[in-house]
């Protein structure tokens, strides 16, 4: 009986360890997908990547919260890639995903869910704020900020949290503590806390744009070179560099 009890306890502990690791692997794979998306050669290739990834989420054995998290992150990337030309479709997609998050979060505290979901939902709301005005815009922006802050409260060294919050700060007005300087600090934290090549690549990429906004092209170029060195076959940093020379930031 003692051996059976020990084995039962061991099995429970193993499950507790494996499940978060499986989820973390899924989130790491999302970043790989995101980089592939950035480096896709055409709109058709982007759409193909998105559909393949959507099917991958649907077929996975992740739980409800983890699947919702990945679909939320995917919705953000899909609308970002679609651009302003697809504004109506983007608004519909963002609103639908926001509703799914609200339904899942009903009766739950923000502190009860994983940091990736908090950041993904915050990204959804920050983009919805761009479709709003007046009090609605203020409410969406404020709620997104609280979600970012809750995620970073749970994990102060969460690279994606600092990255997304940095982007929020970049577009936020100075009265809300925003601006390129504030964004640079957040992006720099994302660089410092990166644990994988994918995390560092994205953090360097975003930080380079803050440097451009602050008229420091040398540091921007250094970040883009460092990002490229992580994935020598990638081509996106070259496109970003060319855009910067023409006064364009890749996330604007």
Where are these regions (language model features)?
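Bacterial N-terminal signal peptides
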Residues: 8-18
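TPR-repeat structural position
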Residues: 43-46, 87, 91, 141, ...
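Amphipathic alpha-helical repeat scaffolds of TPR domains
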Residues: 25-36, 61-85, 111-132, 157-173, ...
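Terminal, low-structured helical/coil segments at or just beyond the last alpha-helical repeat
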Residues: 201-203, 210-252
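Hydrophobic/aromatic packing residues within the alpha-helices of TPR/SEL1-like helical repeat arrays
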Residues: 53, 94, 98-101, 105, ...
